[in-house]
Amino acid sequence: LCGSEKYPVRDPFFMMTRRSLNTFMNAMTSSDWTAYPFASQNDKDFNNLLDVYLDAVFFSRLHELDFAQEGHRIEFSEEGNPDSPLEYKGVVFNEMKGAMSSAVSQLWQGISSYLFPTTTYHYNSGGDPAEITDLSYEQLLNFYKTHYHPSNAIFMTFGDLDVTDFHNTLEEQALK
């Protein structure tokens, strides 16, 4: 995630890992869910993290330049050399090329595709590198608007926290 309405910084999660007392921060995607887990033993820090996460998930900026950086773009293979061949680059594109470079990953994805031909499990949740370059910025925006909404979310927490305060924060920042 590359910033939000309240936090228009380039990478709020990286900024928080350096400034937070968190004991855990991450984001993970599977075939039919995405999770944004975090933990902190400090109440003020927990609430700061909650604020950043809620805003980043439900009010993401999703600028086209961020899509090019994170998703895919075309660059010269040798920076500054316009005579070098063009190649696809991008954070997710490169991560998925690496993830799908093992025989086990390819076998698992191939089996899943055949076992689940008509469900979300048919697809690689991170994206097939051969198809990532077909994704447009507009398609990403439409997917985000359709799926990243509080009505499509489950909020879970545990620990010694005031549930009423937590509920009020969700109401004020995500469910309004």
Predicted regions: what they are:
Residues L65-E75, H147-H149, T157:
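Conserved alpha/beta enzyme-core scaffolds, especially Rossmann-like or related mixed alpha/beta domains
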